[in-house]
C-alpha cells in the first residue's frame, strides 16, 4: 500500500476485530439486513473482475477440459494433490459467507450457489489464472493485481465487510456447535451467551 499506510494496517485490523466482537455481543440482528446485499455485491465484484481479465489469456478456458486436470495430477503427483487441496479450500472459504443461513431451505441455498455464487467464483478464478498467465509477476497477489487502481479502496472496504460477515457466520456456527455439544453432554457445561 505504501504512503505510510503500512503502519496503520495492524491498528485498523485490531479495530475491525474489536468492532466485530462488540457488534456480536449486542446481537447482529439489526445489521443482518445488510449482510445479503453486501455478500451479493461482493460476489458480483468477484465475477466482474474475472470477466475483465479472462481476455488477458484466453488459454485459461482450457481449464474446463478434464484432460488438463488429469494430466496435471499425473505429471505433478503430490504437488498436484496439494494444489487440489487449495481448490477445495477456496470453495469452503466462499461457503463461510453464508454458513449461518440455516433459516433458508435447501432449494434456495442450492439455487443461489449454482446460479450465482459458483459462476462468480469461477469467473474470478479464471480471470486470476488468465491474469497470472499474462503477467507472471501477478502470481504473488493475483486478486489485487486484477483490481483497477481507481477501484482499490471501494473493493478493499467491500472485501473487509465480506470478511466481517464471514467471520460473524463462523462465530455464530462455533457458538451453535458448542451449545449443541453441551446439550448432548459431549462438552462440559458452560454459560453460552450470543
Model-derived regions: residue spans:
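The structured alpha-helical core of multi-pass membrane proteins
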Residues: 1-194
